[in-house]
Amino acid sequence: MKWSEVFHDITTRHDFQAMHDFLEKEYTTQIVYPDKKNIYQAFDLTPFEDIKVVILGQDPYHGPNQAHGLAFSVQPHAKFPPSLRNMYQELENDIGCHRTSPHLQDWAREGVLLLNTVLTVRQGEAHSHRNIGWETFTDEIIQAVSNYREHVVFILWGRPAQQKERFIDTSKHLIIKSPHPSPLSAFRGFFGSKPYSTTNNYLKSKGKTPVQWCES
């Protein structure tokens, strides 16, 4: 199965015209992130048949030169967001690799679907595009990955992500849960949770190639 088939299935069962119209107006009259051409970049960089890991975020970063369509990732020369810095600290503690770029395209190309549950946001207004239809779309994406792929690791950081557990078949996938890597919660159990090594150990146990989390 390919993303085109997944999207066709979703759009035949749900009407996204109101969301489409809303976004057309928003992109015309407001500053919206990411750039329109990057809204679906997570799907462009991670083919459906290559998915090994899903990391769920919430909505895109709402500052300039940050969001580019991948959850938690920012553009190459942007300042490190605090959550990403904590993700990298845990990466170093977990498997000993030090990353210097805030850009996660290499993870996406390794089969890590970096999926926000809302794919657009107005500049400076966090959560401004909630409840326009994105949640329906991304819930269906999670369900499709669960239904049609085997032995995927779903990494759910924080309560909003963990509410999506109901869409995942735990008999054939691994779910890794911990507090969110944001500074507000990282010390409540994110640090020390070892999501990267746990993911790779599971993938290897299923005969899959582990993720190259470190910069090559």
From Swiss-Prot:
Gene3D superfamilies: Uracil-DNA glycosylase-like domain
One annotated GO biological process: base-excision repair, AP site formation via deaminated base removal
Gene Ontology molecular functions: uracil DNA N-glycosylase activity
InterPro entries referenced in this protein's UniProt entry, alphabetically: UDG_fam1 (IPR002043), Ura-DNA_Glyclase_AS (IPR018085), Uracil-DNA_glycosylase-like (IPR005122), Uracil-DNA_glycosylase-like_sf (IPR036895)
Pfam families: UDG (PF03167)
Disulfide links within the chain: none
Enzyme class, broadest EC rank: hydrolase
Catalyses which reaction(s): Hydrolyzes single-stranded DNA or mismatched double-stranded DNA and polynucleotides, releasing free uracil
Superkingdom of the organism of origin: Bacteria
Function noted in UniProt: Excises uracil residues from the DNA which can arise as a result of misincorporation of dUMP residues by DNA polymerase or due to deamination of cytosine.
Protein name: Uracil-DNA glycosylase
Organism encoding this protein: Staphylococcus epidermidis (strain ATCC 35984 / DSM 28319 / BCRC 17069 / CCUG 31568 / BM 3577 / RP62A)
Taxonomic lineage from the root: Bacteria, Bacillati, Bacillota, Bacilli, Bacillales
